[in-house]
Amino acid sequence: MAASCNLDVIGEDGGCALTGGWQPGAFERPYMGFDARLLSTNSSLCSELIFSAHLMQISPTPQPREQVDVCEDPDNDPPEPSCAQFVDAVADSLALDKLCLICRTIDLYRRQFGLSPQWIADYAMLCTKTLAAPPCAVATVVAAFEFVYLMDKHYLRRGKTTLVGAFARRVLTLVDIQRHFFLHVCFRTDGGVPRCAASGTAPAATAMAGLGMADKVQYSNYSFLVQSSTRAMLLTVADVPSGDDGALQAVPHGRHGAGRPADGGGGVFGPKQQSTVAALMSWKECAKMIDCSGSERRRPGATMTCCERARADDDEYERQLLSTENTYLGSADNQAEGGNDTHLKWGYADLTLLLLSQSSTWEASEKTSLASQSRRACVEEYWASHRTVLARDTAPRFARFVDADAVPDTATGPVLATTLKHVRSRGRTCAECVLCNLILTREHWLALRRFKRDVISYSSNNANLFDCISPVLSALSDANSEPLAGDCGVGGGGTCPEDSGRFLELMHAAGTEAIYKHLFCDPMCALVELQTNPSVLFSPIGPPPEPDEIELQKARLASENWFSGRVCAGLWALAFTFKTYQIFTPKPTACAAFIKDAGLLLRRHNLPLISLEHTLCNYV
């Protein structure tokens, strides 16, 4: 996997690609984690990750001659290419008893080269940033990019080894990245229940003692639930109905996929998915053991739930940001980005547009059409230029998908990068939320908070919140718009970030229903917002830190070995169960029981949402 260069990307001339495609000076700046400017250091890796986010189609295996109906018309058209076998191969990574390939990769480097203290410090920063980032498609791609960046930064010159090309060869997949950094979170040390103080530091005794057996068993049960849910939704992408092997029934799919949007009915669990059914049915017992608001795990003296603490921290961060906004925007950003590199600041928004246009958006525009065309062209060009190399150097379990009949499925979109990995749509909403991806940029995080306040305060009467979204969005589209409310809290007012229209473009592309779902209805979107820790994810407020300060911070993170989430795993168990039930509708009695129990858990966390019943039945 990470052996010498004969296992890495081979150039056109047959020589070793020892540079890995990195720009000169790519590894010179101190690593800070989730830095949008890093994407510009290796365009080849960006193309590779976009390619690896798409499914592969192959011709279905023909039936044995003795099974063919003798009366069948020999002139029938051959079956269309299918992604079913590829989906099955990818979904295998989400089994609980499969090795984490990211952990295995790190272990291979450790055994072959040793892990330097500098690498450990950088990796600790990456882990900290992913725990503070919103789980979304762009975050998954960024985590993959920066994982490769760190391995090459420390081992490309020293070991003449590069991870560039590993995702194209399917040695690693974006599903492995999601599992390691966002689903199971192999490096997490809090057992799924945030125990950190408001300052973000770990209790010394807890950090020293680590997790007990009971904590790890309970967290493994949670991990099985979320991985099984993700796997079940991924398997719905297979475009053939289930047979006697018990695979999931395919769901008519896609905003722009191979079928019409699905407006009713649910998927069907087959016999092989009965363990997933059992896990979903027992979600409440699973959540109870990893719920910060429950009697089993509430810490003595705790007065705030994880959600209340996260909201309080966000409010305080926004107050600090706005108190230094003029100085910060006038100097620090410009110093950090320097002249002609200002556009790199919006790299995550541009990546959102590229990945999600026409696969997770409803309102078409010239920019979304061009972005969708660019994504398809990127995938097709990468496949055309690397196909020969990949045919002789691809992971064995994916070797079938580089044969002569294999072709990337560009119509379905970057399914493997998305959080929920299905392509179903309902009520003008899609599996991947555009607004969740916007949160990765500080200015857009702030703009979304202001936008929500403007929607809530738009009318002093009892106007429907849904009806308030369009006029607020329309007012924001006017460059000379005035604040919509006199005083709607800190940072109130209808202002937009100066991002050359990126924020408005993506908000319009998402559509009113998707905005409404994200802001007020969907438990997954609500948790994504709360999980995002701006004081950790974004660069510090004020002047950029000195390189020595950055290195000291990373060393502290590595030595403390305290990696805690912001939202307790019990709420994530609820959210994943909710999203799975949107695709696989439970029976009425089970559905009513779930809505009741989910509502109680959300109320205990003081997390108000509009009508879980409506969201469950009308959105995805």
Swiss-Prot record:
Q: Where is this region: Zinc finger 2?
A: 433-525
**Residues bound to Zn(2+) 2:** 433, 436, 518, 525
Region Zinc finger 3: which residues? Answer: 306-605
Q: Which family does it belong to?
A: Belongs to the herpesviridae UL32 protein family.
Q: Name one GO cellular component term.
A: host cell cytoplasm
Which segments carry the region annotation Zinc finger 1?
Answer: 100-186
Q: Where is it localised?
A: Host cytoplasm; Host nucleus
Q: Mainly localized where?
A: host cell
Where, in this chain's numbering, is Zn(2+) 3 bound? 306-307, 568, 605
Its function, per the record, reads: Plays a role in efficient localization of neo-synthesized capsids to nuclear replication compartments, thereby controlling cleavage and packaging of virus genomic DNA.
Q: What is this protein called?
A: Packaging protein UL32 homolog
Q: Which domain of life is it from?
A: Viruses
Q: Which residues bind Zn(2+) 1?
A: 100, 103, 180, 186
GO molecular function terms noted in the UniProt entry: zinc ion binding
Provide the alphabetized UniProt keywords.
Host cytoplasm, Host nucleus, Metal-binding, Zinc, Zinc-finger
